[in-house]
């Protein structure tokens, strides 16, 4: 069964090519992740470099179709930016303006639509919260990274 991987900001900042590494599955970038990436673009560190690389990569893919409908990837998967699920119920005590909670809200909304949703994040607290609201969750690590990406440095300095 095809999986739907929702990718957290920290995964893209860690490895901008991560969005290409989920084989023939769907990859979702919640709109709040784009907002968070945008906040890193002027950073002079590796995080800033990776945010800029990710922006160029997503922009390059955007030219192949509509991100809100999904863009076919070379590996058979599909990339999509998700802007919906603002009305999906979350625990009343959770601040819906907090980025992590918005990401979880997107995951929950997609799950309620029948998708096999997996949140991929390097954030341990987000993994704990995902588990608390019954969202499948995994850390991003080597099993997702294609062979060609394993030898690259974490800072990506070349153009897409």
Model-inferred region functions:
Residues 157-160:
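Positively charged, low-complexity/disordered segments
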Residues 3-118, 124-155:
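Active-site-proximal, substrate-binding regions of enzyme catalytic domains
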């Amino acid at each position: 069964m095809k999986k739907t991987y929702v990718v957290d900001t920290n995964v893209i900042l860690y490895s901008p090519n991560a969005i290409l590494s989920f084989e023939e599955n769907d990859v979702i970038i919640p709109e709040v992740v784009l907002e968070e990436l945008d906040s890193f673009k002027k950073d002079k560190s590796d995080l800033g470099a990776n945010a800029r690389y990710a922006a160029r990569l997503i922009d390059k893919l955007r030219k192949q179709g509509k991100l809100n409908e999904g863009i076919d990837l070379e590996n058979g998967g599909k990339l999509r930016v998700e802007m919906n699920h603002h009305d999906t119920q979350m625990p009343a005590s959770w601040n819906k303006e907090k980025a992590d909670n918005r990401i979880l809200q997107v995951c929950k909304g997609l799950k309620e639509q029948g998708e096999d949703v997996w949140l991929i994040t390097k954030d341990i607290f987000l993994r704990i919260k995902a588990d608390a609201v019954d969202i499948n969750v995994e850390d991003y690590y080597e099993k997702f990274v294609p062979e060609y990406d394993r030898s690259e440095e974490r800072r990506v300095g070349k153009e897409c």
